[in-house]
Amino acid sequence: QGNNVKTDNLSQIGHNVSIGNNCLICAQVGIAGSSRLGNNVVLGGQTGISDNILIGDNVITGGATKVLSNVPSGKIMLGYPATSMDKQIESYKALRKLPNLVKQFADLKKIISKKR
């Protein structure tokens, strides 16, 4: 474990895990065996990291993020599975449009079926 690492309560750090300097591990985080955290990493509460994962320097994960693959340095990751914050926001915006798209699709199906 590196210098100046803060670990909150109810966190589980597996065997052979390497943690860099200046890391913050919030409550209820689980890090599976042989994973490696770079320097200045912040893991939000209930983040889960699969085994043998490399987390680069200056990475932040949002609460309840599940990391299933390596994360390059400087990324902000959210969700399950973990994706970059930009992609997660894009997905959220698209999801808000879904009810209207479903209605439009149903309307188009009615129009097409009437023309047959």
Which residues fall in each region the model found?
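Long, leucine- and charge-enriched amphipathic alpha-helices
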Residues: 83-116
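Structural signal for interior beta-strand "rungs" in well-ordered beta-sheet cores
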Residues: 1-84
